[in-house]
């Protein structure tokens, strides 16, 4: 399950990203680390995402998170660009990567498995649809922990 602070963090981060021509792709708050780590992946909408994009976003976001007191106590802010193994989260990404190999991880076993590798067919309101060597499968969305591009088809 996503951390309960993530919606507030996203609400704070998205306007800053938009102002810089960036898009927030993924937000993860790892509270099992000391100090906790807030990792935000951003993508430049007009060109390859560079270190400068991440630095500018981080410098503008950090004071806003502090001012709004969203995260209590000390934490580490990591801003990076999504790699090829990034999580697919938006409708746009699921459309753009239709036909690509993906890895789906579930919170609980579905048909006795917690990890599925196949070709992305689509995502709808109810499920993530994959093609597994010619066989179609629909994994209920409420069970899906993450969907990543898979570089090992």
UniProtKB/Swiss-Prot annotation:
Q: Name one GO cellular component term.
A: cytosol
Compartment(s): Cytoplasm
Q: Name one Pfam family in it.
A: RimP_N
Q: Does the keyword Cytoplasm apply?
A: yes
Entry superkingdom: Bacteria
Q: What keywords is this UniProt entry annotated with?
A: Cytoplasm, Ribosome biogenesis
The family database entries (InterPro entries) matched by this protein are listed as: Ribosome_maturation_RimP, RimP_C, RimP_C_sf, RimP_N, RimP_N_sf
Return the Gene3D superfamilies for the record: Ribosome maturation factor RimP, C-terminal domain, RimP-like superfamily, N-terminal
**GO biological processes:** ribosomal small subunit assembly; translation
- Family indicated by similarity: Belongs to the RimP family.
Q: What does this protein do?
A: Required for maturation of 30S ribosomal subunits.
Which HAMAP family does the entry link to?
RimP (MF_01077)
NCBIfam families linked:
PRK00092.3-3 (NF000935)
Please state what the protein is called.
Answer: Ribosome maturation factor RimP
Organism in which the protein naturally occurs: Picosynechococcus sp. (strain ATCC 27264 / PCC 7002 / PR-6) (Agmenellum quadruplicatum)
């Amino acid at each position: 399950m996503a951390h309960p602070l993530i919606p507030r963090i996203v609400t704070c981060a998205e306007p800053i990203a938009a102002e810089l021509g960036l898009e927030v792709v993924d937000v993860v708050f790892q509270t099992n680390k000391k100090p906790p780590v807030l990792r935000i992946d951003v993508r430049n909408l007009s060109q390859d995402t560079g270190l400068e994009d991440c630095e500018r976003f981080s410098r503008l976001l950090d004071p806003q998170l502090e001012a709004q007191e969203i995260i209590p106590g000390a934490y580490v802010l990591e801003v990076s660009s999504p790699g090829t193994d990034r999580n697919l989260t938006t409708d746009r990404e699921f459309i753009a990567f239709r036909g690509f190999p993906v890895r789906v991880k579930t919170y609980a076993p579905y048909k006795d498995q917690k990890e599925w590798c196949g070709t992305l067919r689509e995502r709808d309101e109810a499920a993530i649809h994959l093609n597994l060597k010619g066989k179609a499968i629909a994994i209920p969305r409420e069970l899906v922990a993450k969907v990543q591009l898979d570089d090992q088809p």
